[in-house]
Each structure stands twice: as C-alpha cells, then as structure tokens.
C-alpha cells in the first residue's frame, strides 16, 4: 500500500504496511515517516480519495488544500472517492482547478463517472 505524505503543498507517496512507523500531521492525520520508501505516482493504479462531498458528475469537494487537485494534474491512476451515501450530492459550481473523480464508493453504491483513466 502506498500512503500519502504531505510535503509543503504536495502529496508524496510512500510504501506502508501494518506496523510501520507513522507520524501525526497538524490536522491529526497519520502519514508515513519521511524515511519510508518512496513510490512514484506513475506506478499507482488506484487513488482512494477523501472528500467532503461528491457531485452527480464526479466533481469532488475536498478539504480546501488543493492537494488532490494538484496531484491529479499528473497522476493517471483511477480516482475513487470514498464516503457515505449522504455525501453524494447535487453538483455545485466547480472551479477551473477542480479535477473530477472516476468513481464514488459509498456504504450503499458504487457510481462510475469517468471510468477511463
């Protein structure tokens, strides 16, 4: 499993398995330590993506940092948003930098928007 690590305004990915060392970010999120083995984003086939909401056309409402929007400019893996059914909502006005998801997985459904990647 490759997990994201925040470095400035970028997400870098590192190998992680149960028992490996982690550290807690300012937001309280665990991430791999800096010395963990790096993983190139070109080798990642599936990005499990956190979100606050997902629109009916796959537009993702994130947490405001733009980390995943910047990542998805170059990352080519399948972008799967994961949340609860209540987070699959009507669309809102996306901004120019927003990148759509390929799919959304909730406790009640799997929806594919842009299955090609």
Where are these regions (language model features)?
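Hydrophobic/aromatic beta-strand patches that form the interior of the parallel beta-sheet core
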Residues: 2, 48, 78-82, 103-105, ...
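Extended, well-folded interaction surfaces typified by the phenylalanyl-tRNA synthetase beta subunit core
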Residues: 1-41, 80-94, 99-101
């Amino acid at each position: 499993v490759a997990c994201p690590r925040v470095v400035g305004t970028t997400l870098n990915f590192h190998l992680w398995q149960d028992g490996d060392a982690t550290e807690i970010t300012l937001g309280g999120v665990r991430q791999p330590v800096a010395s963990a083995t790096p993983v190139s984003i070109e080798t990642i086939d599936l990005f499990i993506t956190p979100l606050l909401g997902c629109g009916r056309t796959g537009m993702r409402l994130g947490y405001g940092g733009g980390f995943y929007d910047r990542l998805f400019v170059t990352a080519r893996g399948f972008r799967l948003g994961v949340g609860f059914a209540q987070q699959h909502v009507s669309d809102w006005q996306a901004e120019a930098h927003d990148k759509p998801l390929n799919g959304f997985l909730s406790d009640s459904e799997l929806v594919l928007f842009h299955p090609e990647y």
